[in-house]
Amino acid sequence: MKTICLLLACCLAWTAGHAQNDSLQTDSLLRSLPEVMVTGERPIVKAEAGRLVFDLPHLLKDRAADNAYEALKELPGVTEQDGRLLLNGRPVALMLDGKASTMSASQLVALLQTIPVSRLKDAEVMLSAPARYQVRGQLINLNLQRSLADVLQGEAKLFGRQQHDSKYGAQASLLWQQGGWAADAYWRMDGGRAYHVMNDESRHTLHDGSLHQMDSEQRTHASGPVHSYRLAADWMPAENHRLSLAYTGNYAKKRNDLSIDGAVKAASRYDGHNLMQNLRMDYATPFQLKAGVDYTYYEAPMKQELASLLPTGRLDYTTHNNQRINRWKFFAQQEHTLKGGWSLNYGISLTTTNDHSWQDYEGSTPSWGRLEGTPHRETITNVYAGFTKSWGRRVSLDLSLAAERYHSEAFSEWAPFPNLTLQWLPRSGHVLQLSLSSDRSYPEYWAVQQATNYSMGGYGEIVGNPDLRPSKSYQLQGLWLLHNKYQFVAWYEHVDDYFVQTNYQRPDRLVMEYRWLNFDYHRQAGLMAHVPVSLGQWLRSSLSAYGVWQHEKDGDFYDLPFSRHVVYGMFQVRNTIVLSQRLTMQLNGSYRTRAIQGIFDLPASGNLSAALEWKPLPQRLTLKLYGNDLLETNAIAPEMHYHTQHFRMHTSSYREVGLSLTYTFGAYKERRHEAVDTSRFKQE
């Protein structure tokens, strides 16, 4: 019933926007997307040398998005999953002002949420980022507005939201600029409590044929404030000379209280914190040379106390562990603009990491649960070269090749990463683009440590895997942009050594083992269509539809080799209703059909959200009321029924209602912010 309601709500405003002229519905595709529909409209997107550039102020007009993170979700093909953004259903790198983001998903979300939409200029979307960007794969580069005047500007925001428990927060931003000097600062705090329930149904079969029903219910109360802060300064001694220095920090104090009932009866408490500090300096010259250094320190100490009664006995222990990271990155890059539409670029980067992690137990636990504090070191060296060539305004080519050497105690390897983007503009407003790219992804540092943590009251063991290898991926994509408005994308991706954390009911012990493993490969092919429709000045709607084929194979998955494939669909509808000059409403819905991950089946899920935004003082004061997951259909219940493996997990989902108040002074236009990569650090 909830699914039916979700689909009806998603289609409501779309139906209104689509009911324009019957002749438009019966014509061919090219005629049903006529020029008359865009007459008098300023193009939202245009093509530039292998990328699509979206005019964000125009795209976000009357939208309820009030920060950069929400703004990115308005781009065609962009969706949100587990707190991170995807482009066409696959991972995408994010940049600010053309500088690679090195921040983890959670840190990047916190940063983007501090940037108001009034500071956004445009977003450059690339299906295949050239090597000069020092990232690989899909990329969204977010450019911010800049002011040349001497200014003192800022913004303050208060917000609160209610799910099962309440959360609250505040943030402040400030920019000062005078002459050749500029400085900016921001601070954000998130507080409150969170509550969720997880129900596990586990039918566990051992070697002796005995069957054990290990069902349990886990209730978690989580609390702890999170503080994000940044100080930065720029010095511009002459035109096109810029020396930048920035300090970014994040501190999160965490406390989780768990109670478990069922086949396992347990009480557990987690106490700890995460601290990240980053210092970055870079210099840009007028002759297109850029160089810099980046240093990151990260620590995540944690203490867990567990008292548990299992069918196999009792666990009563205290564990202490910590991850401490020191990482340096040095980089330099050079570009040359040549005659005849040619340009040349090349560069080098060196990243060194020292991971000093340890773990120790006190109490009734086996000795193999301990991890000595042996440093783990790795070095990544990357060199690249590339060129671009334009033939008039209609045809452009961007070709580059990067060579990367990864070295650690486990293995050492060189790997090439070619990249190609070919773009053709057959006529005004029409773009055809073909891209080929490759990438390598690395597991988080804690995943490769020989450490063991307990979950589910001791029935679950989270085990590290020192033999985990990086994955290699290859992507081929094609894009068709019609009338600078309608977007169609096709892609194929092959990933060798695809790694994912999965669980396995051990046949020799009554234990559910969680471990990161490499699959043989992961393959995916898909189609995406994005169609916007407007009805007068009061309704703007867009529909994005995806069709995806996915295949995963692993010939040595414990004693259960598998080869599984699925075809699934995703649908997303966004509607903006202009009620008055100062009052707008947004109604968004999404739905995904059944999918898979390894031997898991992922049931269908959906989300319905709404927002009402009032601006009593335009450009100064904004009040926003919003609701997310209104039908409580966003959480899924993954399950596996494969040979001897039978398990189902259901996580609670609560609708969220929130209210925010934002005050801006000085027509604030924030300067660029750097990001810090903590994606491979241990997160609790």
Locations of regions flagged by a protein language model:
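Gram-negative outer-membrane beta-barrel transporters
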Residues: D520-R592
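Short, acidic, small-residue-rich periplasmic hinge/interaction motif at the N-terminus
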Residues: N21-L60, E80-D82, G89, E124, ...
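Transmembrane beta-strands of outer-membrane beta-barrel pores
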Residues: L158-H164, Q178, M189-R193, G249-K253, ...
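Face-selective signature of the C-terminal outer-membrane beta-barrel domain
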Residues: W181, V226-A252, A267-A415, N419-G429, ...
